Amino acid sequence: MTATEQLTKKLIRVGHSPDPDDAFMFYALAKDKIDLGSYEFEHILQDIQTLNERATRGELDISAISIHAYAHVSETYALLPSGASMGDGYGPTLVAKKKFSREEIARKKIAVPGKMTSAFLALHLWLAD
């Protein structure tokens, strides 16, 4: 690649978590396994809540975000037709030292990965039933 070609590359900032599923999705870009043409990608690895917050400020060109956060950024970002980190047996999990009823859980203090995460939304919807 010539110096002129290097100067004309368009930089795209991509935010994703360091989790294995995101690492898999972005591996080919990060390791130069595909021809990027006139694009250059900067990988920004952060936790999902931080990525959600950055998306609300429009700081990244492309970003992994929670589906819950998408409701807050749908005017700025478009959903891609693939990619997801939830499914049967995978996704938000509530962990406790002993078993509690839903009513007991509703009265407990619960740690969540962020208020704009799918885990928080799922918990909120489950407790509201």
Protein language model features and the residues they cover:
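N-terminal hydrophobic or amphipathic helices and topogenic motifs
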Residues: 1-85, 89
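Bilobed "Venus flytrap"/periplasmic-binding protein-like clamshell domains
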Residues: 7, 11-31, 92-129
